[in-house]
């Protein structure tokens, strides 16, 4: 999957198996967690692109530790990669 098709899937929006909701609003990816704090998180398209390109370069746990577990759950769901978080 290339970045443009990944972004198109994000524009559709949805839920991860862990219940996080995601959607695109303008040029930002918004992720709302399903946890008790119901935290909201958003990042720009440029950051999404950088994360999309960096994830294959490192293991999932390393990416989640250095950057964002929330984004990784969405990435794993959209790309079909197993989510080991």
Model segments located where?
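Intrinsically disordered, charged low-complexity linkers and terminal tails
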Residues: 1-85
């Amino acid at each position: 999957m290339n970045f443009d098709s990944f972004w198109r899937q994000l524009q559709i929006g949805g839920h991860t198996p862990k219940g996080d909701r995601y959607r695109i609003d303008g040029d930002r990816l918004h992720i709302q967690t399903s946890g008790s704090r119901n935290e909201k998180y958003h990042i720009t398209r440029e950051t999404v692109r950088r994360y999309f390109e960096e994830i294959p370069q490192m293991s999932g746990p390393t990416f989640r530790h250095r950057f964002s577990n929330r984004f990784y759950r969405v990435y794993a769901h959209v790309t079909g990669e197993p989510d080991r978080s």
